């Protein structure tokens, strides 16, 4: 079975841009292509490779220039397009171990595979699962298989203290 043109394009873009992101010390989180009037919009989402921290605007600008140059050199996208390079943002669902490692120290809400919800501070994340100090004060360990998804809660007070 031959992949659709869109699937093939996304695969070529990912193959092209993963090493570009890695060369900038970043992780290629996602690539999407969508119509934008007479053009196409190429959205590239980059993140730090692992662990807590924030991707600075200067680093993102440098990576954006590297992505743009790679796209121009490879001529993978035919016709005019608009390039958008961004980070996942705080509303990204936490679905992979790397996402949880990136959110260490943050307040999170988890939806467990059993359907229940747990909120608390994400203390750590390792290869086996995550360790959360719940709102009730207990430290609980969850295996990744037991967590359907998670999300970071924006907390202004915590940012002001840190």
UniProtKB/Swiss-Prot annotation:
Subcellular location, principal: cytoplasm
Species: Beutenbergia cavernae (strain ATCC BAA-8 / DSM 12333 / CCUG 43141 / JCM 11478 / NBRC 16432 / NCIMB 13614 / HKI 0122)
Protein name: Ribosome maturation factor RimP
Transmembrane regions: none
Subcellular location: Cytoplasm
Function: Required for maturation of 30S ribosomal subunits.
Family annotation (SUPFAM superfamilies): YhbC-like, C-terminal domain, YhbC-like, N-terminal domain
Entry similarity comment: Belongs to the RimP family.
Keyword set includes Membrane: no
């Amino acid at each position: 079975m031959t992949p659709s043109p869109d699937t093939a394009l996304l695969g070529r873009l990912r193959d092209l841009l993963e090493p570009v992101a890695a060369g900038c010390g970043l992780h290629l989180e996602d690539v999407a292509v969508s119509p934008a009037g007479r053009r196409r919009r190429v959205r590239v989402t980059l993140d730090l490779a692992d662990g807590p921290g924030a991707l600075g605007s200067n680093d993102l600008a440098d990576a954006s220039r590297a992505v743009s140059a790679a796209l121009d050199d490879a001529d993978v996208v035919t016709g005019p397009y608009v390039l958008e390079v961004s980070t996942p943002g705080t509303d990204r669902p936490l679905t992979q171990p790397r996402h949880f490692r990136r959110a260490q120290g943050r307040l999170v809400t988890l939806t467990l595979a059993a359907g229940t919800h747990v909120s608390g501070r994400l203390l750590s994340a390792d290869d086996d699962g995550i360790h959360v100090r719940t709102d009730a004060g207990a430290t609980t360990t969850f295996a990744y298989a037991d967590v359907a998804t998670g999300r970071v809660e924006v907390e202004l007070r915590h940012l002001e203290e840190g």
